[in-house]
């Protein structure tokens, strides 16, 4: 790889919004002589890195987009996308081109944020509602969430739910010996810090002897076996335990649902519904539960409510369950999930409909049955009589020989430890592939000849007898024209980065450049099975190695793990590393975690999951950690102090001056420093956590390193650690050697959502060290510019001793609420009329707005946002002056819709134009919100989380 000869990288100039002329004007506005001078005022000198960011290999200036894509092609060429019949929870699938082009590759979908503002999120909320409906129908359960991270972590979440819901007081959980190995590994990791015991065995034989609060049963099993689980579930429930069934969605189109079998909870992966394997992810997992458990569900739930006119409107329901509300009382830290992938899987079901899904399943099963018949002729009868798509055969000492023959034909089989081979078929399996497998076992058969006499392998008494996907949405869009228009209609309802800036504080909604997204769907990256032989993924390993080194250079840490597939999972993995370190030193009693009151909600939730006791540290009037309170609590808990979790710069939008002192205090009492990297966009190239006292951090690649938010996922949260914690990074059964790791797996795949690492990799590749540093400087400039412009109208709550903010700022309208009744919610909804997504509301300070503009937004867009906020302040002044009451004001009626402007009557004290086209907005390019203000309380009182079946429509018609 060689750098460009030009003095400046073209891509960095395109990524960074303000031009040089804009930067000069903005510096004048904020009263700084230069970017360097502003950085000296915003950052404490004690944390500044001594040398410019050096990424090595001539990458100071980065590559051009053309050169970067050529380099990515060279990496892709080192991968080998063999036909993988490994199974183990991952399947080949066909992503319909219309969905790939119009969702996966469409910035209207992939640049959106989590739909906390429902009025501007109706499109993806409907798509997620469809996902939940699909899951409820296929699993036969009442309520589903809007995705989890992967199947293994979904099972771990189900275990936690079962423990919380069960009346049984034991701390043991039963694990079916047929669960996937990666699931067992993640369960072990999750159970150990909480003091839970795993009991592994055959549920049909061993459950009656087990005293457990719940059990997970794989359906079909990892070996492919299809078992009637009803006796085991009945035994479990008679003893007060909860039944978790980990189910294959495609199999459920032909098999009796978990609900019919008696399950309380169903979990699994939606990967084979159109999402490429991607060497491990990202994929949407799912969880569905009986109605009585709905308030214990982790993650997001989309519900149906009404808007201000009584029209149906979607929203996120039951949010008081979630980690950002429950904090240290949470049993799950799920934050970012896999929304974009859930949308793709739901559209796959819309595309195929129930008949199409069943036909795919029947074809897969028929080819599996035919394969089994041929193997039986060869003397390799499958070990299980009943199967859906996976066979396990005993091959004795011929395992390597047969697997080697398969490899020579470009086919991966699953090599098991007990002299067996696993063969899993999928949507991509052709008769020719089946014939090739037979050849590896020593004979050539004609597929047609064998198929004509092959018996089916599905048990008749487990056949599906209940309907699914009966709602019209799964029947009305069968032509590409109709489906294309449906997806376009939904995307038009939403406001994403392709329309306007999204100034969400602590979320870093920056540009996800098109070039960064291109390699993602290349077959050489998308088509690899995560457990394929390492030699087939040399391009991936080269990417991992180089990207890890870049993160080491950026952070000052000594080792990196790419496994955590969300920021919250990164927190969890980092705390497990600290826990493992203390245990290895004989300090297992160190379980106290100090957390400032301003912390992200995931911090206390992650600490709770890691078996730690949360002790809250106060913040002072400036928003900084109260160092005196920290010192007192560190001393009070010195014998048991495990760690502090601190976000830097703080969630108050300021670089705290005493961060080194904070680290020193914790270290002096035997604790470790976990520095939350959510705000790393303010540090890259300027300061390195590993240099000023932190021991471990996670990095949100979906923030700082340009993976798009996808409407609520995917994300990645790799962790960096200092050398003394390196041996406590997450392990994985697919990559561990003979010696078990000190800390187990936290994700289903060894490198998490590996395929989207290509996005962050190419971003760094094109930005180079200079570009990344410049991006950080401009992000800080943009935040200070917004703070300067808005402060006369909405006071900026926190600044450092030199009057500067970091990369975000908090504005405080609470006095206006006290005087006029205008709430932060009113301001947020009124911003929609101006064409903007609201800033972060009421975090970390209730009643305030936190704004993060990022480096990607131009001065023109920043000015448009500031002008909108100032115009809203003038509207509030009308209320102050008594010309409007707050109830009759455009703020309380916001957002305004086409129904407002088209209404035959208008009795409000402001004009239609004032309401619908407020000052400075364009009538030509107006974003029309599809619904009025959504009634959140109504939605929780009248919870509806899936589409009603067709018989409900028929009954309503009667």
From Swiss-Prot:
GO terms for molecular function: glycine binding; glycine dehydrogenase (decarboxylating) activity; pyridoxal phosphate binding. One of its GO terms (biological process) is glycine decarboxylation via glycine cleavage system. It is an enzyme of class 1 (oxidoreductase). It catalyses: N(6)-[(R)-lipoyl]-L-lysyl-[glycine-cleavage complex H protein] + glycine + H(+) = N(6)-[(R)-S(8)-aminomethyldihydrolipoyl]-L-lysyl-[glycine-cleavage complex H protein] + CO2. Its cofactor is pyridoxal 5'-phosphate. Gene3D superfamilies: Aspartate Aminotransferase, domain 1, Type I PLP-dependent aspartate aminotransferase-like (Major domain). Belongs to the GcvP family. The glycine cleavage system is composed of four proteins: P, T, L and H. NCBIfam families: gcvP, PRK04366.1. This is Glycine dehydrogenase (decarboxylating). It comes from Nitrobacter hamburgensis (strain DSM 10229 / NCIMB 13809 / X14). The lineage of its organism: Bacteria, Pseudomonadati, Pseudomonadota, Alphaproteobacteria, Hyphomicrobiales.
